[in-house]
């Protein structure tokens, strides 16, 4: 049986460098520029997308997204995904962050990992969404952990279907230090 404590990843087990790549889908899809003066600070105010906007996506809102930075290739799983699948989302630069020690991050690798975490942080959205009884309460989870990492694709984790590739949702910005920008 998987225990929740087995899913906690220490900072040393994550990629030391993380990258934030501006730009996403939607109506305002464009080549956004990163402004270091606008990096969020401290513990972020996190909620669940289904609570915030009513959309049936099991994702946190109010967080800071990164993906493990591959220096040799000047990118990450997320920047590669955007280039290949959604070229309009691609931005030509990324902001690199160094992971600070002591970060407490939940790392999910499988559907059983997800179910174990969801059991501890349930959110009932069944009145609004299909399978709504299996949603995560991101606000509660964010108060106990610094981040939440999806270790790979969501293909085997149906409840995280809107997370396409390896990425980390950060709840506590004190665990990331901005080191500069790079072309991706």
Predicted ranges, named:
Residues 6, 75, 79-80, 140-143:
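Charged/polar, solvent-exposed surface patches and flexible loops
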Residues 50-59, 64:
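A composition-driven surface/loop motif
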Residues 12-52, 82-184:
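Active-site and NAD+-binding cores of ADP-ribose-processing enzymes
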Residues 70-87:
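Short active-site loop/helix that positions an aromatic residue
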